[in-house]
Design a protein with these regions (language model features):
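Auxiliary alpha/beta "docking" domains used to position bulky ligands
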Residues: 1-164, 203
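Processing junctions and N-termini across compartments
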Residues: 159-165, 185, 212
Length: 221
């Protein structure tokens, strides 16, 4: 649980990301950046955010097919039903139960609204943002779908998670395209997930060989 207050401000990091054009063709990040940096613009009556994560990794080695060049690799998260529909159904049910318990109104979001799920989840104690900028959980690694429930009532905060990365650089070292330009800084225009999902144009020749047989997304980091 995270309290919405003036200290819940992600504007500096977001502005830097956008100014460097590290978001590439994801113009939707610019259009509602004010909502991302201030959750109350999204809903001015919101007082607390309940953040949630659901593990989506199954028993498989997500990198085992990299050497089999006659096969295309699809990111683990998209090998099942659309997670938006599954999580929204769960969120709706949970939100109604919370509203009855706390006598409050609510709005719930999963990935499609301008909510900074990762830093909010860190403040809410689910995990910490690793050097690859993904959220890392002690129990589930980076294999989490994140969602949130906004409520118009103050709830006691949970303890924020701290950064446990230390001197580890595994995520940086494993990135095929060097998209993690420095610890905690991602250039999405070099990221294979961006290039194979969000990018609609021609992929730079220098990046094509590095992408290998990944045809939709990337799970390396």
């Amino acid at each position: 649980v995270v309290d919405i207050n003036p200290n819940l401000d992600f504007e500096k990091e977001l502005d830097e990301f956008l100014e460097k054009n590290h978001h590439g063709e994801m113009a939707w990040m610019e259009k509602r950046s004010n909502c991302r940096s201030n959750p109350n613009i999204l809903w001015d009556e919101a007082q607390s955010i309940i953040v949630l994560g659901i593990n989506y990794h199954f028993e498989c080695n997500s990198l085992e097919l990299l050497s089999e060049k006659n096969k295309g690799i699809i990111s683990v998260y998209s090998r099942n039903s659309d997670y938006h529909k599954i999580i929204k159904k769960k969120l709706k049910s949970l939100s109604f139960e919370i509203s009855k318990l706390l006598n409050c109104s609510f709005k719930y979001f999963v990935d499609t609204a301008p909510v900074m799920e990762k830093p909010i989840s860190m403040k809410g104690g689910i995990g910490w943002q690793g050097k690859h900028t993904n959220l890392v959980s002690k129990d589930f690694g980076s294999w989490l779908f994140l969602s949130s429930i906004f409520v118009d009532k103050k709830i006691n905060n949970t303890r924020p998670e701290i950064d446990h990365c230390g001197s580890c650089s595994s995520c940086i070292d494993v990135c095929p395209t060097n998209a993690i330009v420095e610890p905690y800084k991602l250039d999405a225009t070099k990221c294979i997930s961006y290039l194979t999902i969000e990018h609609k144009g021609i992929i730079d020749k220098n990046l094509r060989k590095l992408i290998g047989n990944r045809i939709y997304g990337c799970d390396d980091c």
